[in-house]
Amino acid sequence: LVYRDIQKTKNNVIIKNDLPFEKSDYEEKIFTHPTMLFRYSAITFNGHRIHYDYPYSTEEEGYKDLVFHGPLQATLMLRAAEKYKKAKAYFFSHRGVAPVYANDNLFINIENNENGNLNCFTSTKDAGMTMKGEAKF
């Protein structure tokens, strides 16, 4: 969870993060559909309205759209890493660096690293890198 100061603003500034590597060994594209966010909120008992209540998310919290779940983003990244490696990871770490919003394309990028494990990151066109991680096999 990320707690922010209460502020009502229409001036959403997007800071574009640099991507950690130019070309991925593997990439998936996921559309961040609002229904996916609602369902994930339901199955994880997450009642935070920024994930499913558009007027609340945009008018009260000042986001540009519904906010995509960080844990869902991490789960999708781990799933893509295991699919690419065709094995189950014994360790996975991740860190969110920028928000992802509904109604956008989320790119999941996987790259082999020198230790035989995988570097992972997610990105959007507007924000650049949104989450980074490593899967160990």
Q: What are the functions of these language-model segments?
A:
Residues 1-32, 100, 107-137:
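HotDog/MaoC-like acyl-thioester-processing domains
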Residues 63, 69-109:
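Hydrophobic beta-strand-centered segment that forms part of the acyl-chain substrate-binding groove
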